């Protein structure tokens, strides 16, 4: 805010009488915009790599999975694809889709199938084999949640249309430079004015054409004039023209007179600050410009391209009602600032996802160390009973059958045994019922979770049945 008041004070003094350094306040916002653009050009975004913590989670998950499930992924060859598997198991998959996970599960199986593998050498001792059956579903739910977090980081960022470039680095080149100033290879500068061309042939003239294409050319045209009173002592010799000819290498010399650092360190904020100060300067100039011209600087002759003027004209952008945001370099600079903010937010989101995946791995390892049947679900913080053993479930089913005292009540999966001496046990669980109960329980143990998510590690049928179908 103090900078803004200072610039306003400079403006009011200049409006009374042109003096040495009159254009300094008009020059500074261009300096700020130049420096902010260079800082924005350095910002880039890459999709994060596959997290090592997620690799460990998937490896733990496949290690505790039923053997029938492991068999699906044991073949690490290129022919073992999701598409091939899905085509052969349309009915048993029941809408499940592992396409994004398939290759990662295959890799997890390759990492763990040999007992002497490097991963097993480091991690197998963490697995509590005594509680595998009770932890299996919980570990799989962690794998699901962790993989979903990773998938959320894999959507490419789309550059905004207003940027008119594929990256901030490419956008910066257009913001800083245009003919006759070409961007350098690194995008951090422009080639300079050479061979002293005329200002009238190089700078935009009058209302028939517009300034504002790049910052570099606006800077050259603003500061190139034949009147020494328009410049500070530091730039007087460098910028003062003779015979209306621009000075050789003038852009580099002008930029050397800019402050070494922008007012604000954060690039997007610095860019918006530069545009705000520029808008303030233009607003102060309207009252003293003829016929409502919108100019940056001071017009001394017919237009800003004349040798006696030190200005850049933006009238046409305001005449059409679009205002400062329609000036090409301003429009692109603001779009670049917005995209920079998007990149920073995405980086923070990716960092949070990595932290959450690491926390899930820690929860997984704690679960291996915790005895007992009761599991705590990481996603909700609520408790649910872990899958009971096959033997327990079979015993419960047998007891349910035994409760049937009459043959007419003893229906499938129970079977009436009239030869049984114990009258209380004549209705008993059939062999088919016992097998169904076993397969049902093994299916629960082999699932990643019990939600039925279509893109999870769940095959919506018994892994044992799937293994049979693969044969």
Swiss-Prot record:
Disulfide bonds join 401-414, 410-427. It holds the Pfam family VSG_B. It comes from the Eukaryota. Transmembrane segments: none annotated. Residues 1-18 form the signal peptide. InterPro entries: Trypano_VSG_B_N_dom (IPR025932), VSG_C_dom_sf (IPR027446). Glycans are attached at residues 61, 133, 449. Residues 448-457 have a biased composition (Polar residues). A lipid is attached at residue 454 (GPI-anchor amidated serine). Residues 373-457 are annotated as: Disordered. Keywords: Cell membrane, Disulfide bond, Glycoprotein, GPI-anchor, Lipoprotein, Membrane, Signal, Trypanosomiasis. GO terms for cellular component: plasma membrane; side of membrane. Residues 401-447 have a biased composition (Basic and acidic residues). Gene3D superfamilies: Variant surface glycoprotein MITAT 1.2, VSG 221, C-terminal domain. It is a lipid-anchor; GPI-anchor. Residues 379-392 have a biased composition (Low complexity). Residues 455-471 form a propeptide. It is found in: Cell membrane. VSG forms a coat on the surface of the parasite. The trypanosome evades the immune response of the host by expressing a series of antigenically distinct VSGs from an estimated 1000 VSG genes. This is Variant surface glycoprotein WRATAT A. It comes from Trypanosoma brucei rhodesiense.
């Amino acid at each position: 805010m103090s900078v803004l008041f200072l610039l306003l004070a400079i403006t009011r003094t200049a409006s009374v009488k042109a003096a040495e350094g009159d254009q300094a306040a008009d020059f500074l916002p261009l300096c700020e915009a130049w420096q902010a653009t260079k800082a924005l050009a350095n910002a880039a975004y890459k999709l994060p790599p596959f997290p090592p913590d997620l690799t460990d989670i998937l490896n733990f998950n496949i290690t505790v999975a039923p053997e029938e499930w492991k068999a699906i992924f044991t073949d690490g060859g290129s022919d073992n694809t999701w598409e091939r598997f899905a085509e052969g198991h349309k009915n048993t998959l029941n809408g499940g889709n592992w396409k994004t996970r398939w290759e990662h599960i295959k890799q997890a199986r390759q990492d763990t199938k040999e007992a002497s593998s490097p991963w097993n050498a480091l991690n197998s001792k963490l697995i509590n084999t005594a509680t595998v059956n009770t932890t299996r579903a919980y570990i799989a739910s962690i794998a699901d949640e962790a993989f979903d977090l990773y998938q959320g980081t894999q959507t490419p960022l789309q550059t905004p249309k207003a940027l008119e470039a594929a990256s901030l680095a490419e956008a910066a080149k257009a913001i800083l430079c245009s003919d006759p100033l070409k961007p350098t290879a690194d995008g951090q500068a422009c080639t300079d004015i050479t061979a002293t061309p005329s200002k009238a042939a190089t700078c935009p003239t009058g209302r028939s054409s517009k300034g504002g294409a790049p910052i570099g050319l606006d800077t050259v045209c603003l500061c190139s004039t034949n009147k020494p009173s328009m410049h500070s002592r530091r730039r007087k010799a460098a910028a003062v023209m003779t015979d209306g000819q621009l000075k050789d290498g003038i852009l580099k010399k002008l930029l050397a007179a800019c402050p070494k650092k922008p007012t604000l360190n954060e690039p997007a904020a610095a860019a918006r600050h530069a545009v705000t100060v520029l808008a303030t300067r233009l607003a102060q100039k309207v009252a003293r410009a003829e016929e409502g011209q919108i100019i940056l600087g001071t017009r001394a002759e017919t237009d800003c391209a004349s040798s006696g003027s030190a200005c850049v004209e933006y009238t046409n952008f305001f005449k059409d009602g679009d205002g400062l945001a329609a000036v090409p370099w301003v429009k692109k600079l603001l779009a670049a600032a917005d995209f920079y903010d998007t990149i920073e937010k995405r980086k923070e989101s990716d960092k949070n996802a990595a932290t959450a995946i690491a926390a899930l791995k820690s929860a997984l390892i704690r679960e291996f160390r915790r005895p007992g049947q009761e599991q705590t679900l990481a996603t909700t913080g609520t408790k649910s009973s872990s899958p009971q053993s096959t033997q327990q479930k079979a015993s419960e089913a047998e007891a349910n059958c035994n409760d049937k005292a009459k043959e007419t009540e003893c229906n499938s999966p129970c079977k009436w045994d009239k030869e049984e001496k114990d009258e209380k046990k004549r209705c008993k669980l059939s062999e088919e019922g016992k097998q169904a109960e076993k397969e049902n329980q093994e299916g629960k143990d082999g699932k990643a979770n019990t939600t039925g998510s279509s893109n999870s590690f769940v095959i919506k049928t018994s892994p044992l049945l799937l293994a049979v179908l693969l044969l």
